Amino acid sequence: MAVELKKVFSTILRFLALAATVVAVIVMIRSHDSAIVLNLTFSAKYNNTPAFKYFVIAEGIASVYTIIVIFLWSKGLLGRLIVILDMVTTVLLTSSISAALAIAQVGKKGNSHAGWLPVCGQVPKFCDQAIIALVAGFVAAIVYFMLLLCSLHAVLTPIFAVKP
């Protein structure tokens, strides 16, 4: 009974992580805005920034991995490899969000020391969409951290179980 409950909980978390990563990818890819500054058209898109590209790629990798695990794990084919792959996915998501958040912060606030001006005032639609994507990515990272804890618990419980 307890094993089945853990499996159901992990499956629900995986579907939640899948939803969050897919939303993050779709919203970030569709984020764009343009503004006219001094008779020049300035276009803001996710692929203008390597950090946002990395974010989209990392979230996409996590989505594909999640789909694979949902279908293979139900057949019991992955075993302890899931722990390692969950850890890699958690770290990948965390690093991509960190990079994207750093760029988003510069876009919102600018950097007076480097002479970079904030751009969110000129392209608010892009910034709003990027924030939504980053929130979804953050949710995915939190869910994956919870999945990592569940995976570790599932693998380590039999090792440390007291045998009568």
Swiss-Prot record:
Q: Which residues form the signal peptide?
A: none
Membrane spanning segments where?
9-29, 54-74, 81-101, 130-150
Which key words tag this protein in UniProt? Answer: Cell membrane, Glycoprotein, Membrane, Transmembrane, Transmembrane helix
Q: Where in the cell is it found?
A: Cell membrane
Topology, Extracellular side = 30-53, 102-129
GO CC terms for this protein?
Answer: plasma membrane
Cytoplasmic topological segments: 1-8, 75-80, 151-164
InterPro entries (alphabetical)? CASP/CASPL, CASP_dom, CASPL
Q: How does it sit in the membrane?
A: Multi-pass membrane protein
Task: Tell me the superkingdom of the source.
Answer: Eukaryota
What family is reported?
Belongs to the Casparian strip membrane proteins (CASP) family.
Instruction: Fetch the NCBIfam families from UniProt.
Output: A_tha_TIGR01569
PANTHER family on file: CASP-LIKE PROTEIN 1U1
Tell me, how does this one assemble? Answer: Homodimer and heterodimers.
What is the official name of this protein in its record?
CASP-like protein 1C2
**Which species is listed as the source?**
Ricinus communis (Castor bean)
